[in-house]
A protein has these predicted regions:
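Small-residue (G/A/S/T)-rich helix-start motifs and N-terminal tracts that mark the onset
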Residues: 1-80, 189-342, 346, 350-367, ...
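Nucleotide and nucleotide-moiety/phosphate-recognizing core
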Residues: 39-125, 134-156
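Short beta->alpha connector loops at strand-helix junctions that form conserved
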Residues: 83-85, 113-116, 183, 296-299, ...
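Short, small-residue-enriched loops and turns at beta-alpha junctions
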Residues: 87-89, 129-131, 323-324, 350-351
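Glycine-rich, charge-decorated loop segments at or immediately adjacent to ligand/cofactor-binding or catalytic sites
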Residues: 93, 159-173, 349-361
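Amphipathic alpha-helical segments in well-structured domains
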Residues: 95, 99, 139-143, 176, ...
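Glycine-rich phosphate-binding loop
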Residues: 112, 120-134, 315-322, 412
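Internal gly/pro-rich beta-alpha loop/helix module
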Residues: 120-121, 126-218
Length: 502
């Protein structure tokens, strides 16, 4: 997979330093290119009737802001600069350079925040990716005043107050309509709650590319729709066995729907054969809802289950399973004896959370798909603590138990045991509905039996799940979407894949 890199603030600083020190590109050249890139975007959005104001701190982010103000003035726009720390406060070397250049042109500087608040477009260049403390006091007053205006608000690289690594909001935070970030998206711009302050995020190239990693690639990446083009079309010379046999162990009394959703999503993701293991009481419901599924009911012994495991190429276990004694037997048997890849979801995770040693029993690759509540039980951490560092927690769990972890939230995080991580950027709030997780487990399982690659199945599975929800959003809206709508969206995704494929 060739995916979009997502960087932390520290990684971006290293890229800046490497570009200057190894490739000999002066830092001021990068700053000028950053400013020019932002100005190109602004000129494309706003005509010369608009008045601009740039709020500057005293670091390199402020240097970017001053350069933006200069270039806007030179392009015939009206733009003022407001120095939040005062005109006499010393700052970084590049800040001082840009401040002196701006002064030579004698462009407008104001000392009254009220002048700024009367502008049509207000640009935040107060703090960049290096901010590690809460914004309080007079600086908070400045941001608060600006946030109350009707002006368009633009952030340079990151909105001031957003932690560029974890998405925390640190004190009073600039509320942007647009964020122009440099070279690569920052993790904090994508995670909640920081993402709520970013508006539309656009990457502005400044002359830094993958060469500057010097082999030290970031651990976090993301998929987008262009990555669907990397998926191969199904071969014409094939049969149902070509595309894998998936065993879905799901459902309990009154929970037949979970089995149906997971199995149907697997079929709609290309699995050749899907067999459902479920209680006999679910037979009529499942056969009516999904006649394509094979059915095996009332597995009462480990030996009987092992026979079914021998048939399959991969297993999904957990949706609607309950925590009954029989369910516990099924989970324990799968973990101890299965010699095929596993997708573990829902009640199977809840069973494991009562006896974490079970997760050390697996012989083959495992994908776990917990939501925050299930991860809280698995890790014995509060949901709040998990949200403080959702990428780190997913990575820790994956490494600790040698699994691929799909941690479901507003931004689902996929973490592999080898340290590689993905942020899923597809999906919408309509997908926060009963059964959505069952659909995800089926998609991942359906891809897994075809590809036999847990990392690829997990990353693409999460992305395709979200994209399917996006595909049907116009028809359902956020209030009307249900899990089966997401399955309907899979048809649209695969049509797109086949039209754009090789």
């Amino acid at each position: 997979m060739i995916l979009e890199y997502i960087v932390t603030g520290n990684e971006m600083k290293l890229l800046d330093d490497t570009t200057s020190q190894v490739f000999l590109v002066p830092s001021v050249v990068l700053m000028e290119q950053a400013a020019a890139g932002v100005v190109r975007e602004l000129v494309a959005c706003f005509d010369k009737s608009k008045e601009f104001a740039v709020i500057c701190g005293r670091g390199n982010n402020a240097g970017d802001g001053i350069a933006i103000a200069r270039l806007l003035n030179q392009a015939g726009y009206r733009c003022m600069v407001y120095y939040a720390f005062g005109t006499d406060e010393a700052g970084s070397e590049l800040f001082e350079l840009q401040k002196n250049i701006y002064a030579r042109y004698d462009f407008k500087v104001v000392s009254d925040i009220e002048c700024v608040c009367k502008s049509d477009v207000i640009i935040d260049a107060l703090f960049g990716t290096g901010l590690k403390r809460a914004i309080e006091g007079s600086l908070a007053d400045v941001i608060s005043s600006v946030n109350k205006t009707d002006a368009y608000r633009v952030a340079v690289d990151v909105p001031s107050g957003v932690d560029s690594d974890k998405g925390h909001v640190m004190g009073c935070t600039f509320k942007a309509d647009f964020t122009y970030t440099f070279s690569y998206k920052k993790t904090g711009l994508l995670l909640w709650p920081g993402c709520d302050y970013c508006g539309l995020v656009k990457v502005v190239p400044i002359g830094i590319d993958d060469h500057s990693f010097c082999g030290n690639l970031p651990s976090v990446r993301a998929l987008d729709e262009s990555d669907l083009k990397k998926l191969d079309n199904r071969p014409a010379h094939s049969n149902k066995g070509t595309f894998g046999k998936l065993l879905v162990i799901a459902g309990s009394r009154n929970m037949a729907g979970a089995a149906v959703l997971s199995a149907k999503a697997a079929y709609k993701s290309g699995a050749g054969l899907v067999k459902i293991i479920t209680p006999e009481c679910n037979r009529s419901i499942i056969q009516c809802a999904l006649p394509e599924a094979l059915l095996c009911t009332d597995i009462a012994s480990a030996k009987a289950l092992e026979t079914e495991l021998d048939w399959a190429d991969a297993v999904v276990i957990g949706p609607g399973l309950s925590k009954s004694d029989n369910a516990k037997m099924l989970v324990e048997t799968v973990l101890k004896t299965a010699e095929i890849p596993l997708v573990i979801d829902a009640d199977a995770l809840n069973i494991i959370s009562d006896n974490m040693t079970l997760l050390n029993e697996h012989k083959m690759p495992v994908i776990v798909t917990p939501h925050l509540g299930e991860m809280s039980r698995l890790m014995k951490k509060s949901i709040a603590n998990i949200q403080e560092d959702i990428i780190g927690v997913a990575g820790e769990f994956a490494s600790l138990y040698n699994v691929t972890c799909v941690l479901k939230d507003f931004r689902t995080i996929i973490a592999a045991a080898d340290g590689e991580k993905f942020i899923n950027l597809s999906g919408n709030c309509g997908m926060a509905t009963a059964g959505s997780g069952d659909v995800l487990s089926g998609i991942v399982g359906g891809l897994l039996v075809q590809w036999r690659d847990t990392k690829k199945a997990a990353a693409y599975g999460a992305f395709i799940h979200g994209l399917a929800g996006d595909m049907v959003f116009d028809n359902t809206g956020s209030y009307g979407m249900i899990a089966s709508d997401i399955i309907d969206g899979l048809d649209k995704v695969w049509i797109k894949v086949e039209k754009n494929g090789n």
